[in-house]
Regions:
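Glycine-rich active-site loop/strand segments that organize a redox cofactor
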Residues: 47-95
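Short hydrophobic core segments
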Residues: 5-7, 30, 132, 152-168, ...
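Glycine-rich loop(s) and the adjacent beta-strand/alpha-helix scaffold that form part
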Residues: 157-203
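A glycine-rich dinucleotide-binding beta-alpha-beta segment and adjacent secondary-structure elements
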Residues: 127-129, 134, 306-386
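An anion/pyrophosphate-binding glycine-rich loop and adjacent beta-alpha core
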Residues: 34-42, 50, 56-57, 186-191, ...
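Glycine-rich FAD pyrophosphate-binding loop
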Residues: 21-45
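Feature captures the FAD/FMN-dependent oxidoreductase FAD-binding
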Residues: 75-157
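N-terminal Rossmann-like FAD-binding beta1-loop-alpha1 element of flavoenzymes
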Residues: 3-29, 404-408
Length: 409
């Protein structure tokens, strides 16, 4: 039996502590906040998208950074293992669109309560309001921790599960990165990810609050396509957000360091250029004397129609029967490729996750143990791993935490 200290009471830390205790170790979970799962509490807009019920091949395809590093973690703890654990812990789950898994109650607090019960039942000592400042090592192995109040606690194994840099108000202030660096670990460059983006165009701000459904969103760096998907997005006072944009941000954030990127919205992806042109011809021929500025409301929401009229460059007072073939072709092109310029991503305060973290080449993938410091383990967002939206990032936390708890000897 080993004496184990887990630093961080988020998803990864709670899972690591639970598994280590179930395997017979004496476990102390240290959390600097006044309660466990503070970031977990706000995930999924307070509903907590605990995992995704897709097959593992699909889940692997949604991992953006270092997917191969996670094979052993997923083997140790799959999405079905997580769902079974939570439901057996007294929290019923449901599966929604996109195979996203939520508590039936739609309350993230029920997930945290479930883990709190499981931790107490397994004998984990939970100490809140305790901030770890340093990890103590002796002869190249983890030996304990120093606390902000000056106290020290000895241990045979240390689990670092302090999260990334997103939502700093929940305690994710980079402590784990600093402690890892102090022990010789490399922390890769970090960026906000799954985050809204700032755009150059003023017309975006004119559409603030407008949500688009069933559109295709594409981002390019010159001619190179970086991202393309179909779904929903939202215009804001600073640019764009919504599921498509959040996912795109994870694929483009590193490129934005160097330059602006071009984005395009296909407002009518179900129609080819020819079909859209035929639709416009039909609409225009039915109301020949209508002014162009009033002719697009059947095709787009009113606020968007107004901006498309302006962007088209066609005289808004022109009667639709006078619109030329060339003008119509430009309108089709605009509808199928509405252009935007992405300037930057928003800050960590608006980011769901952090991209970047402890370099995985310095961590044993089969155990999550440090290759540099014996008895030191890593779990969750602290590592250089991340995925797209849909419950995948929490699955990374559960799986890496579980593997740590099962690997400590």
């Amino acid at each position: 039996m080993s004496k184990v200290i887990v630093i961080g009471g988020g998803a990864a830390g709670m899972m690591a502590a639970l598994k280590a205790a179930e395997n017979g170790h004496e476990v102390t979970l240290l959390e600097k906040n006044e309660k466990l799962g503070k970031k977990l509490f706000i995930t999924g807009k307070g509903r907590c998208n605990v995992t995704n019920a897709s097959d593992m091949e699909t889940i692997m395809s949604q991992i953006v950074t270092n997917p191969r590093f996670l094979y052993s973690a997923f083997s140790d703890c799959s999405n079905t293992d997580v769902m079974e654990l939570i439901e057996n812990g007294g929290c019923p789950l449901k599966i929604e669109r996109g195979q996203r898994v939520f508590p039936e109650s739609d309350k993230s607090s029920d997930i945290i309560s479930c883990f709190s019960r499981l931790l107490k039942k397994s004998g984990v000592e939970i100490i809140l309001n305790k901030e770890v400042t340093h990890i103590i090592t002796e002869e190249g192995r983890a030996a304990g921790v120093s606390l902000s109040d000056g106290k020290k606690i000895s241990a045979d194994a240390i689990v670092l599960a302090t999260g990334g840099l997103s939502y700093a108000s929940t305690g994710s202030t980079g402590d784990g990165h600093r402690m890892a660096r102090e022990l010789g670990h490399t922390v890769t460059p970090c960026f906000p990810a799954l985050v809204p983006v700032n755009t150059k165009e003023d017309w975006c701000r004119a559409l603030q609050g407008l949500s688009l459904k069933n559109v295709t969103f594409t981002v390019k760096d010159g001619k190179k396509k970086l991202y393309e998907d179909f779904g929903e997005m939202l215009f804001t006072h600073f640019g764009i957000s919504g599921p498509l944009v959040l996912s795109a941000s994870s694929k483009i954030v590193k490129k934005l360091d160097k330059n602006q990127l071009s984005a395009f919205i296909d407002l009518k992806p179900a129609l080819t250029d020819e079909q859209l042109d035929a639709r416009l011809l039909r609409d225009f021929s039915q109301e020949k004397n209508k002014q162009f500025k009033n002719a697009l409301n059947g095709l787009f929401p009113a606020k968007l129609a107004e901006q498309i009229v302006i962007l088209s460059g066609i005289n808004p007072d022109k009667e639709v029967n006078a619109i030329t073939k060339e003008e119509r072709a430009h309108l089709v092109s605009l509808t199928k490729n509405l252009p935007l310029t992405i300037l930057s991503v928003r800050s960590y305060n608006e980011a769901i996750i952090t991209q970047g973290g402890v370099k995985v080449q310095e961590v044993q993938p089969k155990t999550m143990e440090s290759k540099l410091v014996q008895g030191l383990y890593f779990a969750g967002e602290l590592l250089d791993i991340d995925a797209l939206t849909g419950g995948y990032n929490l699955q990374l936390a559960w799986s890496t935490g579980s593997l740590v708890g099962d690997s400590i000897v």
